[in-house]
């Protein structure tokens, strides 16, 4: 597994805005998608391209096109939906799979309540999106079900992550690459990231 922190001035600046306790809902949504676009750029650098000839304005011209890689984006409900538009802006042809999970606040273990995967998942690279990688339990459970369905390659994009969660995922799924805007200090006793973003789902959907 490779853990890539996208250490770019634009990412740092935008993430700093998201950390403000009183950031408006509309701004939180917009910036979450902006950061997701930048993470997507990094996560897709290894896509292979091929030369094809198209008809340009002045005649035939040779261009590069992504070669046959089928992609599905997997938002983890509900907060992951807040990054979906950003990724689809970059890869509009990606199919959308949906995984619904919530964390039991007493045990901190993930509870699955909904799964709808794209067809031919065994032929697709899956890109999981979720604002926060905290304990790692939800991500591990999502990776488990994607692998059980036959998905051959999996990546994850996150706004912030905790070291504890990264380690948990690395130990269980060393073949999955993670891209994150920042690795924060730690988890608190309730399993929340510090300094973190607060409840990203509430901030995205205006239910805080």
From Swiss-Prot:
Requisite cofactors: Mg(2+)
Pathway membership, UniProt: Pyrimidine metabolism; UMP biosynthesis via salvage pathway; UMP from uracil: step 1/1
Catalytic activity: UMP + diphosphate = 5-phospho-alpha-D-ribose 1-diphosphate + uracil
Keyword Transferase among record annotations: yes
One MF term in the entry's GO annotations: uracil phosphoribosyltransferase activity
SUPFAM superfamilies with a match to the protein in the record: PRTase-like
Enzyme Commission number(s) of this protein: 2.4.2.9
UniProt binding sites for uracil: 193, 198-200
Regulation affecting activity: Allosterically activated by GTP.
Biological processes per GO annotation: UMP salvage; uracil salvage
EC top class named in words: transferase
UniProt function note: Catalyzes the conversion of uracil and 5-phospho-alpha-D-ribose 1-diphosphate (PRPP) to UMP and diphosphate.
The protein's name: Uracil phosphoribosyltransferase
Provenance organism: Nitratidesulfovibrio vulgaris (strain DSM 19637 / Miyazaki F) (Desulfovibrio vulgaris)
């Amino acid at each position: 597994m490779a853990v890539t922190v996208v250490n770019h001035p634009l990412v740092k600046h935008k993430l700093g805005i998201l950390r403000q306790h009183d950031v408006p809902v509309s701004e939180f949504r917009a910036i979450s998608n902006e950061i997701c676009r930048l993470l997507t750029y990094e996560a897709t650098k290894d896509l292979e391209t091929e030369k094809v000839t198209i008809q340009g304005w002045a005649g035939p011209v040779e261009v590069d096109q992504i070669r046959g890689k089928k992609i599905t984006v997997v938002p983890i409900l509900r907060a992951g939906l807040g990054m979906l538009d950003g990724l689809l802006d970059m890869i509009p042809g990606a199919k959308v799979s949906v995984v619904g999970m919530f964390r039991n606040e007493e045990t901190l273990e993930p509870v699955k309540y909904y799964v709808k995967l794209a067809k031919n998942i065994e032929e697709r690279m899956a890109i999981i999106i979720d604002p926060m990688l905290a304990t790692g339990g939800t991500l591990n459970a999502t990776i488990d079900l994607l692998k059980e369905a036959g998905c051959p390659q999996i990546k994850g994009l996150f706004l912030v992550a905790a070291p504890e969660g990264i380690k948990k995922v690395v130990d269980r799924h060393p073949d999955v690459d993670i891209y994150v805007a920042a690795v924060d200090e730690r988890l608190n006793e309730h399993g929340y990231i510090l300094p973190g973003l607060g409840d990203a789902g509430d901030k995205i959907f205006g239910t805080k």
